[in-house]
Amino acid sequence: MQTKHNQIVARIEQFGPGKAFSAKDFLDIASRTMIDVTLASLAQSGKIRRVRRGLYDMPKINPALGGELSPDIDEAARAIARRQRWKIVPEGAWAANLLGLSTQVPAKIIYLTDGPNNEVPIGRRSIHFKHARPKAMAGLEGKFALVVQALRHIGKEGIGPSEIEKLRSSLSPAEKRRLVKDARFGVDWIYEVAKKIAEKTA
């Protein structure tokens, strides 16, 4: 039978490189005190990286240079949201970048949230959590939320065949079907785009 320490290590290895996490992701395994001690020990030994207070990751390695890559901002945001029990949705330009619809990383990385306004430094960047009314967050979940935010940012006239194909390749068949289902109750043009994205799905 695995020790609590080994169970925590096993879960981190299961997360894989790039995944951000906090003590809250292990509360089903051990006490908070033991988790904190274990994570601090792993960080000190170099097995994981301390991104900021209470937030860690197993860094990805640059295959060409061999050094550690910067923390994944989206992973960090999601780990913070899990810890705080917030619902978050990437806003506009950042959503478009995450989906590959834009190569430009926005100067300000914003997530809509049902939590409070907050700014969290991560490396050389900052994550801005922007409180949104419940009505604005209603129905926005998973990939659907990401796609809708990106489409709203780009606009109807900015969506062409190449954008459709990029979105099509980034979604699983199940996600495409869910996108069409959820988009039915939203803006008409977004629903039409959703149908085009899913039309080749079996």
How should each PLM-predicted stretch be described?
Residues I29, A79-I80, E91-W94, H153-I159:
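Positively charged, aromatic-accented nucleic-acid-binding surfaces
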Residues I127-F129:
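Short, isolated positions in well-ordered beta-strands
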Residues S22-A23, K108-I110, E163:
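Short coil/turn segments at secondary-structure boundaries
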Residues H131-A202:
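Hydrophobic alpha-helical interaction segments
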